[in-house]
Structure formats: C-alpha cells, structure tokens
C-alpha cells in the first residue's frame, strides 16, 4: 500500500511538472529600427506576434523593441539576431553589405511590379537560390516595399539631367549604384538618419517609399516629390529580411515550431509586402496636404 501511494504521488508530481512545462510562456524579443507608430511596428510585426500568441494558445508572445532599443545601429541588427541579442529582427538586407548578394537582383531598376507579387517571387527565389545566405538563422520572411519615390529639398527632378551633382540618399548598394549611373552623387545611409541629413544639408534629397516618409518628416524637410512614371515598373525597391535566431527556434518544442512555421514563409512575405505598399496611398495624402510641397 505504501509503495502504491508513493508511486501515485510520484506520478502526480511528474504530471504536474509536465503540465507546468507545457504551459510555460516563451517571450520572443523582436527588434526593428523604426518608430513605434510605424506600420512595421503596429501591423507587420504586430500582427505576426498576435497570430503566434493566438495559435500557441498563449504559450508564445512577443516584446517588440523599436528604434534599436536593444542597442547598436541598423546595420548591426541581423548580427544581433544571429548572436541571440534579439530573437527575431526585421531589417533591410542591404544594410548588411553584400551578405545577401543573391537577393539584390530584386532591387534592380524596373524589377518590381507590385509589392505583394514581388515578395512572393522573392521568397520562392530565396528558398531556391539563397539558402547559403540564411544558414546562420531561421528565415521567417523576405519582402519588398512599394515603388520608391525621389524627395528633394530645393529643386524637382523632372529629367535625367536634373540628377547631376545632387547628393541623394540611397538605402543599399544596388540603389546607390543606380543613383550614380543616373548622374547623382549617392550617399548611403539607413533611413533613420535621413531627417538629420536633410535638415543639415548633408544631402539634397532621398529616395524612399511614401509610406515611411511622413514619420521621418520628409514632407516638411523637402519641397518636391518626383514620382517615376507609373506606366513602368518601379524605378527601384528595397529587400527586407526577417530572421529568427536559429538556436531559439531549435529550442522550441515541435508544436511551437509548427506555430512559427505556419505564420512564416511565402504567405507572410506576401502579407508584409502588400501591407507596407498599402500604406503608400495614405502617406501620399500627407504630402498633398503639406503647404509648400509639390508633387511632380
């Protein structure tokens, strides 16, 4: 009888430990370089976090760190994820130099049709041709933004000759090479540095999509928006990556890995591209409503 009681108590204790372990909440540290009011923070990353919490029945959740709150500069974000400082990150592929060289084909002029379709194509391409570039992380999504625009301080760009001598900010090597070929003097910098560079006259303008521009006060810091001909594909776009720390992913039980997998990949990449590009139209209205700003 005593043995049976001990066995029962031991079994109950094991069950309690199992239930406790199963019910443990795992909080993922998610980091990006933009502000807390941006669509990247509230929707693109925010929805992903809501979805994994829902699908895991609360066993997974997120703490989103905006504006590089975990330290460092935007070009360091990918390595922060690889090294475990952050569990998940969202960043521009080109901020890591030539680390994602195979993805840069999607930043070539006139490659992008619309951000949703191009993001689907980018994920499919990356799975087939860029696995070596992602070997140190678990890649959750790759995507592009909507058509890039040209914002300038003093004069619009309406013809090829107008590029000559203008110091224009570009996000990645592919885009700065394009600006150089057009006759401009390219200045590479992460997008958070654009407002100060414009206000101090370090640059004459910047190429960025509409959606991020009002949050950077580009409508106030520039006088002109030059829109590339919409009858063509986009003049340029930028590739974004969303990596997860590989060790963190591998430490999850199988059912939670399945939750991450369900909310990542082709469809999530398409969602990211569609959502970011969908913010272009309301952002353009901010420029249209800004006194003294002209769209050509």
Task: Give the ranges of each region predicted by the language model.
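Thiamine diphosphate
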Residues: 126
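Bacterial N-terminal signal peptides
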Residues: 11-17
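Sec/Tat signal peptide C-region and signal peptidase I cleavage site
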Residues: 17-23
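Short, Φ-rich (hydrophobic/aromatic) sequence segments
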Residues: 13, 118-123
């Amino acid at each position: 009888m005593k043995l049976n009681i001990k066995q029962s108590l031991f079994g109950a204790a094991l069950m309690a430990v199992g239930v406790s372990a199963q019910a443990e909440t795992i909080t993922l540290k998610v980091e990006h370089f933009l502000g807390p009011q941006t669509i990247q923070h509230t929707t693109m990353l925010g929805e992903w976090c809501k979805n994994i919490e829902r699908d895991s029945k609360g066993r997974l959740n997120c703490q989103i760190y905006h504006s590089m709150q975990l330290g460092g500069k935007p070009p360091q974000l990918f390595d922060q994820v690889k090294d475990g400082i952050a569990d998940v990150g969202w960043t521009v592929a080109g901020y890591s130099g030539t680390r994602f060289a195979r993805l840069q084909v999607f930043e070539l002029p006139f490659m992008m049709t619309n951000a949703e379709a191009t993001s689907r194509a980018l994920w499919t391409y990356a799975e087939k041709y860029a696995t070596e570039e992602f070997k140190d992380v678990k890649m959750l999504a790759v995507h592009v933004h909507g058509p890039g625009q040209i914002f300038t301080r003093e004069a619009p760009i309406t013809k090829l000759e107008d590029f000559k001598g203008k110091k224009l900010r570009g996000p990645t090597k592919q885009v700065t090479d394009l600006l150089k070929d057009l006759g401009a003097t390219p200045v590479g910098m992460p997008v958070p540095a654009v407002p100060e560079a414009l206000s101090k006259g370090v640059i004459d303008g910047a190429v960025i999509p509409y959606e991020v521009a009002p949050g950077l006060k580009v409508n106030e810091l520039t006088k002109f928006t030059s829109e590339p001909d919409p009858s063509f594909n986009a003049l340029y776009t930028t590739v974004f990556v969303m990596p997860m720390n590989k060790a963190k992913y591998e430490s999850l039980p199988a059912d939670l890995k399945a939750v991450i997998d369900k909310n990542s990949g082709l469809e999530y990449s398409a969602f990211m591209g569609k959502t970011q590009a969908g913010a272009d139209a309301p952002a353009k209205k901010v420029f249209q409503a800004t006194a003294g700003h002209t769209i050509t």
